[in-house]
Each structure stands twice: as C-alpha cells, then as structure tokens.
C-alpha cells in the first residue's frame, strides 16, 4: 500500500487540476496502438513523467494532462481519455490490489536509441526502423565504425535486425551470388574490414559482436530480430575458429570446427550444430524455419506467456499486448528450437503447435537482451526485394507492439525481478 500512496502523491504533482490523460491500449478503445508508444516517448523526452499500467486495459499509459499532450494525441491519431484525480486514483487502487495481476511502472526518461544498420540501402526492410519511424520515436543509425570506436556508450538501447556476424554474408551465396546487390555488399564489407584493420570480414564482425557483448554486460539493452539473433551468438562462440568456406573468405574452413565451438560464449543458445554447406540458407539448427514446414500460414500463431506483473515486471512489460495470441511471420531465423535455448533464458512467446520459442529474454552482466524470431510482423514471408510494409495499414499490430515494448522498457524505473 505504501507504493500505492507514493504513486498517488507522485501523480498529483503533475498539475494543479490533478487530471490525467489515459492512453488505453485494449483492442477496442485504441485506434493506433503503435503511435501511442510514440506519444509516451514524446512525453518522456519533454521531461513529463509517465506510468505504464501493466495488464490494465492492454498495458495502458497514464500521462499528465496538458494541452500540448492532448494536441499531440489528436495530431497523431491516438485515442485518449481524460481522467479526473479521483478516477486516476481509483484505477491505481485497483491495480495495487493484491488480487489483481497488474502493476504500475513509472517511466522516468526517454532512452537513447541506436539502430545497427549499414549506410547503404538494403534489399529488405527492417521492422524496427519502420516502426520507430512510424511511431515518431527518434533513433540514431550506427554501424561498425561507430561500434568499434565505443560509440555504443552513448546509448541505452541497441537494435540489430537482418545481420550476419559470422562473415558469411547472410548465407545468400546460392541464390544471390551473381546479383549486383550481393556483389556490392560483399565488396563494401571487405573494404570496410580492411579500412578498420582486419584481414577478414569475419574477424571484423567478431570484433563488432564483442563490443555489443560488452555493451550489454556493462548495462545496455540489446534487442535483436531475425538472423541477428543466432548469427550473433554463433560469432561469439566461434571466436578464433574459421567457420567460413572459401567463397566467403578466400580459404578453407577449419577442420572439425564444430567440436571447437564454445557455447558458454553464446548469450541464448547451446548445443547447436552449424550448417557447413554454403549453399544452404541457414546458419545452424537453432532456427526452426526448415523444421516447421507442416505449419500453414493460417495456423501460424504464437502465444505470449502470462507473468506476475507485481513479481515479474520485466517480462510482463515486454509482453504487454491487447491479445495473447500473435500472428506468426517468417524470417531467415523464424523461431528458435526450444531444446537449444539455454535454461537461464526466459521463453516469453511460443508456438503451441510445435513448442518452438519465438520471443526470448535474458540477462548478461548488468544488461539484458531480447531475441525475437522472424523478419516483419505484418509480412508473413518477406522476400528479398519486397517493398517495405506500410504501417498505416497495421496501426494496431500486436507483433509490432512487442518491438515497441522493448523500446520503452529501458525507460522504466528499475525494480529487481523477484523470481
């Protein structure tokens, strides 16, 4: 109850009128869930305090009432409700009740966001860049030069998407080796590696992966999707081992390299086998894409786990949504073989048809990481060269909401997980 009374005092300090703006996040009341995150970020950036009401109407946001906040909601098409002091207190009292699986989390400051992305145009979209732009949440693109010069120290949150940290150029060789974009990307990567003082792209990418690892250990938050998940772990575990075939680095791979993989260096995965064939569009058996061929598109959904908001606020924040059942989507790394997920990594979303892990979270040092399988939550089978998803057509996307949960998560006042 002491927490409840503190929150009441905290909220009454917002304005003399003691009224508040609620951004409802349930399925029927909010017309643009994605931009609601942007409004909340905008408020934090302007030094307003905000509260995230976990499991209350889909994970709603409580903001101070100010004319500029109402105006911004109207401009961006975000549904909001104006509450009196008494109404806000009643909601907080309901949330504070021990019988309710709800919690109030105070958001204190807008996190500084970096997106790891190359300077040139890629022949595929990046779901996180798309949704950050759509939600009007500012971010800074960074790449290898910035990472290797300790540029990550300037940020709280780092996103990685369709990346390959193993030096195998995304395993695109079989289908795209003669295409102009593949040839150009390979040349650019080699030029950059040489410029930065590395003999091979794989060595340079490993150095980048290690800087990202150190960023997390030091307290940073890393969010990765698609092939940035498993290729990152593989690169760390294969340090000092040549796993690249001649078409990638000019010489043969190391004999018996599988037996030399050090799984203890990986963040999330264990006991996996690497895919040696350069013509197979796969890094290892971590990915479920080829193992799940019997799951048709119309049945491809994953279920978000339910956590105790009061006792486990971290996974609760990361799983806030207006539905527990989220539409699946493919990627180079679609989902993770649950048998290969380390026991200290939390599975937050799984496909109940085959038990695969889709959405996982863990701690490393003082920091945290979240891995999310798949490429684009609103494009079931996004292909190379496909146009970017138009998010105006998907303003209430549950899959994109999961990405934005991760964006706002570093803004939360830290409270240690109790279980």
Predicted stretch roles:
Residues 1-9:
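Sec-dependent signal peptide recognition
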Residues 13-15:
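N-terminal signal peptide c-region/cleavage motif recognized by signal peptidases
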Residues 18-126, 135, 374:
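Hydrophobic targeting/anchoring helices
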Residues 19-25, 31-62, 242, 341-419:
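Extracellular ligand-binding/catalytic regions of CAZymes and related secreted enzymes
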Residues 21-31, 61-62, 67-71, 121-229, ...:
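Helical hinge/lid and interdomain linker segments adjacent to catalytic or ligand-binding clefts
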Residues 96-101, 145-147, 354-358:
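Alpha-helical scaffolding within the catalytic cores
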Residues 126, 131-133, 230, 260-384:
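Catalytic beta-strand/loop cores that center a nucleophilic Ser/Cys/Thr
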Residues 206, 214-217, 229, 233-275, ...:
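Serine-dependent carboxylesterase/thioesterase catalytic core
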């Amino acid at each position: 109850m002491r927490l409840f009374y503190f929150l009441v005092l905290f909220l009454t300090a917002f304005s003399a009128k003691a009224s508040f703006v609620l951004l409802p996040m349930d399925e029927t009341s909010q017309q643009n869930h994605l931009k609601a995150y942007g409004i909340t970020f905008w408020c934090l950036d302007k030094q307003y305090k905000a509260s995230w009401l976990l499991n209350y109407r889909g994970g709603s946001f409580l903001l101070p009432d100010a004319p500029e906040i109402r105006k911004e909601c109207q401009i961006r098409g975000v549904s909001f409700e104006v509450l009196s002091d008494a109404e806000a207190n009643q909601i907080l009292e309901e949330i504070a009740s021990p019988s309710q699986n709800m919690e109030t989390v105070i958001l204190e400051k807008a996190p500084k966001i970096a997106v790891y992305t190359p300077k040139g145009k890629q022949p595929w979209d990046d779901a996180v860049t798309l949704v950050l732009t759509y939600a009007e949440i500012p971010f800074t693109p960074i790449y290898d030069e910035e990472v290797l010069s300790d540029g990550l120290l300037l940020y709280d949150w780092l996103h990685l998407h369709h990346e390959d940290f193993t030096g195998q150029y995304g395993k695109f060789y079989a289908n795209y080796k003669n295409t102009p974009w593949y040839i150009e990307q390979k040349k650019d990567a080699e030029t950059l590696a040489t410029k930065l003082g590395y003999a091979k792209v794989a060595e340079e990418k490993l150095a980048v992966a290690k800087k990202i690892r150190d960023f997390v250990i030091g307290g940073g938050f890393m969010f990765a999707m698609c092939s940035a998940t498993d290729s990152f772990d593989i690169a760390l575990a294969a340090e000092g081992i040549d796993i690249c075939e001649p078409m990638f680095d000019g010489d043969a791979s190391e004999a018996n390299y599988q037996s030399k993989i050090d799984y203890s260096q990986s963040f999330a995965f264990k006991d996996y086998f690497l895919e040696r064939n350069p013509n197979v569009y796969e890094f290892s058996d971590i990915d479920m894409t080829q193992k799940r061929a019997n799951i048709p598109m119309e049945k491809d959904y994953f279920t978000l786990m339910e956590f105790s908001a009061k006792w486990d606020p971290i996974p609760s924040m990361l799983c806030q949504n207006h539905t527990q059942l989220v539409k699946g989507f493919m990627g180079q790394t679609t989902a993770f073989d649950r048998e290969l997920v380390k026991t200290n990594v939390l599975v937050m979303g799984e496909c109940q048809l085959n038990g695969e892990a889709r959405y996982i979270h863990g701690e490393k040092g003082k920091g945290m990481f979240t891995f999310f399988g798949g490429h684009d939550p609103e494009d079931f089978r996004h292909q190379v060269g496909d146009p970017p998803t138009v998010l105006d057509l998907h303003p209430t996307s549950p899959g994109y909401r999961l990405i934005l949960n991760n964006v706002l998560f570093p803004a939360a006042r830290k409270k240690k997980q109790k279980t």
